[in-house]
Amino acid sequence: MIPRWLLLTLSLLLVWASHPAAAKGNEPNIVTHELDAPPADLFYFHGTNTILYRDRRSLTAHVSFDGGEEWETVKGNDGTIEGTVDLIWRHPFDDNRAYILGENGKHWITTDQAKSWRPFQVDVLPFASMRSFPLEFNGWDPKKVIFMGLDCTILGCLPQTFYTTDDFETVKPLREMTLQCMWAASRPQFALDIDMPKSTGDRILCVVPGLKGPFEHTRTERLIYSDSFFKDDAEGTEAKLDHGKPLSGVSLQIRSVSKYIVARLQSRGTQEQALYVSDDSNVWHRAEFGKHRIEEDAYTILESTNYSIQIDVQTTWQDNRMGSLFSSNSNGTYFTQNIEHTNEDLNGLVDFERVTGIHGITIVNTVKNWEEAKKSDSNKKKLISSISFDDGRTFQPLKADKDELHLHSMTTYAALHEMPLPDHRMFSSPAPGLVMGVGNTGGHLEDYSKGDLYVSDNAGLTWRRALKGPHRYEFGDQGGVITAVLDSSQTDKVQFSIDHGKEWESISLGQKIRPLFLVSTPDSTSLKFLLVGTSSDDTTKTLMFFIDFDGLHERECGSGDLEEWTARLNEKGEPDCLMGQKQFFQRRKANADCFIKKEFAISGPEFQLCKCSAEDFECDYNFVRSEDRKECVPAVPLTPPAGKCKDPSDKYMGPSGWRLIPGNACIREGGEDLEREIERSCSNVTGPPLITDGKPRAGKPQTISAKWTNYFYLERQASNNGVDETIMMLTDKYELHVSRDHGRNWKQIHPDEKFIEMVQHPYFSDTAFFLTDGKRVYYTINHGDSFHFFDAPSVPNKEYIRKLAFHEKFQDSLIWIGHKDCEGKNCRSQAYVTDKRGASWEPMLIGIADGGCNFGYQEGRNNSEKLVICEQYKDEEKNNNRQLVISDDYFSTMEVKFENIARSATKNGFEVVAWYEGDQKEYLNASVSVDGRTYANAHFPFNIKVPQYTVLPSSPHALFLLVMVNGGGERSFGSLVKSNSNGTYFVQSLEGLNVNDRGYTDYDELQGLEGVAIANVVSNREEVLNKGAAKKLRTMITHNDGGQWMLLAPPSKDVDGKNFDCSVTEGKGTEKCALHFHGYTERRDYRDTLYSGSAIGLMLALGNVGEHLTSASEADTYLTRDGGISWTQVKKGQYMWEFGAAGSVIVLVSDRKATKVVHYTLDEGMSWHEFQFAEKELVIDDISTVPSDTSKKFLLWGIDGGKRVIVTLDFSGIWSRDCNDDESDYYNWAPTHPFQEENCIFGHVEEYHRKKPAAECWNAWREPHIHSIGRNCTCTRADFECDYNYEIQTDGSCGLVPGLQPQDHVAQCSQDPDKVEYWEPTGYRRIPQTTCEGGLLLDQDVSKPCPNKEEEYQKKHGISGTGLFFAIVTPIAVAVAVGWYAYTHWDGKFGQIRLGDSGGSQSWLSRDSMLVAVPVALIAGIVAVAQSLPLLVKSLARSSSGLFGRRGMQRPYATRGSFAARRGDYSSVVDDEDELLGADDFDDEEDQA
């Protein structure tokens, strides 16, 4: 018998022997490396122990093939990699590939996990931005890569995109001017479960500038794609984002999310954005978020699944950011809110993570005290943690024993600069069920330093504290080993656990460090770990520790050491179903004394199918969840089957609104089936009117209890969600009203307030402010859907100073100008600023003058976001001069730019200030700035004195000013002057511009048609000046931005087919017979325009045909369909008009005459219809619609018996469909110029999509849609205007102003330091917008080198030895060629270049006159030879560059972005100091275009 004491001893020995492995006396293996700098871009090749990282300091790459124990420097076959490594980029979908991006265009690729590297060349700088990365990968084929780069010169950088389909064996350019590109198949999951053609694998989507180019002030971006790398069509195919139509916006970005592609679009004029989602890149749907708005930088796309997109939508705009978490249905269209008040930081990062490998488990942090945090940023957010086990449908607190646990997440680690490495997580790993985090128990999350390390081995259901204090942690051996290191500035040990974090042992590092990161292989199967930190003794020293737990010598686990673990449990503790299946894992038991030791081999989950339940269904297309989330209700009108619903009481079988979630694996037999059709009532069928009878409808006249009203629309942009058409109205009784349905119903806002003013935000059309008679200001940012208020820092000023000023970029930034010290006599105006929409204010300046203050930010202005420009009285006293002051810090410091100004103004990117020299105030000086800081004096023609001027609407390329010539009240007129591109040199564009006694002028710039303007001039100026005669007005039109003006061509017949009283010259206006219009100075409402921004080419006007403009009572109504070239009379008498549905309908109503009918046209004025809108006649004084003219609804504003009335008109019942985006409903229309052939405008051909007049559908374009920008045209007279000190002569040529000298063009060299040459004045200069090439180059005659640029000039224009033969032969050839050319092409007079086409008139000096032709031919040839020979000797002596340079053949251009004003395309024999036969450097200019 064995003694009992021996049995006890043996039992104790067995217990001791089974203790965790560390007790065996074995230690993990540790190897220490000292690095020059912390590793950058570190990553593991999946399925290996190979690690790659970059040393920022030495520009080297380092690789380890054994998990970090040994390292070597990557040198490449020729050693060129070392010292040139800028970036390391891993392939996200291929375990073998990685890329080293180097300097000078040389890069390397590995396809064998860094064992070897092959160089490739792309001669641009790798480019990363908020839009895209330098490399964009194809998820279907790892060999296909897009390379995003920048091509930089001294003039700046332009994006360049390349692609490869063979691992960079060959690299080809993709397309010019791409802002972002990606493969449609950017993820392996793309088009999952969809049968796609093979060509889809080559499809590339690119965001590119709008066809107007990237540098316009109305810059737009659009999305295009190609399946052939844009080889067949450089323009590609435009993606039809919105109901089968393309869309463009001020900002557009694309990205891939799981199997989806998401396009984010923002329109100009709103911060609201639209998300468009596609799962095949062909069909797109707008994502719907119910009443929530998606705003700029106000949403985050989170880690998503193959059947749903997760998005966090920001709901607060203070520093205390919060949001709401949404999940989409399977096609990404309709989103449902999962949880509110999620925690965000200012960078948009969200406390959100999905547990790795387990479907449906999510951990989020929300704000507990959200109400207090929303009120003030001073109330610190209190965060609490929640977990969902059912894909976000429900959430519950995390529990540690009985206490609630809260964990630090993404925002904390971002603030600590401790974000996880790529492929690594914050909480979880592929180790089944193991989750860890740093946090605390209690009411809410405390500071990170107060947190402890917690662990859960059941996927977050329950937690326990593992270690005290915050730790970095990592998993290994599929959870068999957990390592942790204290996250402090001084720690010298690593702790580890081999029983799921219950027991911990420690290993000494031998020195104290501050850990930077602790990692292992991304699949958590390895026993090798890497710890990187900085030395506590020397922070410049970086240490890397390789830790191998294979040194513990644990045995390999057998089947008895494993357990089956259920991923999710329901409330009953039973395995739960998600997407139709239960999920199970095999994992090591917590107390098993073994390691799995299967590196890179993860046993996947096992699934068990479930019967279908309600959770397996989602809302079908065009259905959305009800508010209680129990039903799917129609999102669009339902259409019953044919023959059904003859009576509202009928019923029919229709769709249930549900469908099985695609990819759901549930068993239908015996389960729920929500897809079955259900019985629906015909009384619930909604939609367009059942009767589409082709007639408009009118509402009953509504009486408003006010004598007068002021109103404006809050316009919806393309990216705005919803369908409301909102009008704000202020009455003479200080009442504020809003209508959200275009005037049918009205609601008074805050009846207890006295509103004195409405102010619409000039840059955001959904925003407006409403001032009371006190400090309170109400506002809306969502088209009047809701109203909020703030208290201004003072009462409004009463000095005609604009009370509010707005920021072009930041909607919440405002300047308020109120009164200060108004209790006594020293009442002054003071400016305040807020960046938080009035939540708090900072005082800026006292003594603000009439011009007020403005934000100086404009798109394209660098470092101008806080620039403010103010007019202020010197020393803050009103009796002193006004000065212009600027500041970049809200006037903590300021700079005085001008000490004695009249006024300042901002227009189209120019800052203009009028100032006096000394004490004289008879004439004004002007200075202009394009950056808001540096002002240059404006130079006016010397024959124009400037007593007063007005800044007019201008193109983005030039500044137009009206300079007063005669200030005699009703007899006032002035000169229209136009600047060069930087606003400093002005030339006279039009003389005698009509001005009224209030300083307004008859000048209209037409929106949509670039360069077209209409103006009225005083034709009898001498009589007005000398005899006091009444003004006689004529109407002029320009089609090239003021370069040329012409009289309007009258129609040949009136509307009744009768002749006019004067003799009409077909297609041309003459001094005796032309068409003249009443202009801007005669309008009651300056918002009324001749044109529509969305109805390209259409205009209406009131006027008469004759020698001059007659009285308004004699005016008739005229219309043009071709941008003002030809006109037709459409109605006798005076009418008011509005355009609707982008020109699909035009409505006319008699102007202030009793009437009860309107007239409308559906075919651009070719035929007209009459509609009676009321039973009795009303006097209508206004007709209105939304400013974009895209609505089918209108409002008539009138008077009935002294009372104000409004009548609504609705034309939506005329047609039932929108136009199809194809040739059946649209045609391509090109604007034309009356002086140019081939439809050339500004040197190129421009085509627009335009609705066919006969198409019975609604034009749904919100703005003119450009079809294409075609080739560049050759230059003609229409591409030039008169140069400085030159003016248009009576015959149309440009002549020197008497007594003046031409401007010395050498000044251009100092304005552009990179300029090599300049041209002597010819009297002409190119219009800034033109892109013409070659042809008639009126601004080029004699070329001169810029000072100190003689050598560069010689290189550009010199002749090389190889060109000797041509140089000798050329003078002789020139003599013959010039003579022959002069004979065959001579078409103008000696000494002048004429107005019109390149040709002149047929006269005795025309080319057909032998009197001219033969002498010219002979003289031209002799002179050419005589001048060439002596110059040839000098040229040969100093030439060193090629005769022909690199010019080559010119190519047509398909995008405006590649257009450039080509100067120097032709050279001539020049003066002695110049080169002979200079060859222009065409290619150099093209590179800079």
From Swiss-Prot:
It is a multi-pass membrane protein. The keyword Membrane applies. Residues 24-1362, 1432-1489 are lumenal. InterPro entries: Sortilin_C (IPR031777), Sortilin_N (IPR031778), VPS10 (IPR006581), VPS10-sortilin (IPR050310), WD40/YVTN_repeat-like_dom_sf (IPR015943). BNR repeats lie at residues 63-72, 387-396, 454-464, 495-505, 738-747, 1118-1128, 1160-1169. GO terms for cellular component: cytosol; Golgi apparatus; membrane. This is Vacuolar protein sorting/targeting protein 10. Functions as a sorting receptor in the Golgi compartment required for the intracellular sorting and delivery of soluble vacuolar proteins, like carboxypeptidase Y (CPY) and proteinase A. Executes multiple rounds of sorting by cycling between the late Golgi and a prevacuolar endosome-like compartment. Gene3D superfamilies: 2.10.70.80, 3.30.60.270, YVTN repeat-like/Quinoprotein amine dehydrogenase. Residues 1384-1410 are cytoplasmic. GO terms for biological process: Golgi to endosome transport; Golgi to vacuole transport; protein targeting to vacuole. It is found in: Golgi apparatus, trans-Golgi network membrane; Prevacuolar compartment membrane. PANTHER family: SORTILIN RELATED, SORTILIN-RELATED RECEPTOR. It comes from the Eukaryota. Keywords: Glycoprotein, Golgi apparatus, Membrane, Protein transport, Receptor, Repeat, Signal, Transmembrane, Transmembrane helix, Transport. The chain crosses the membrane at residues 1363-1383, 1411-1431. Residues 1-23 form the signal peptide. The keyword Phosphoprotein does not apply. Belongs to the VPS10-related sortilin family.
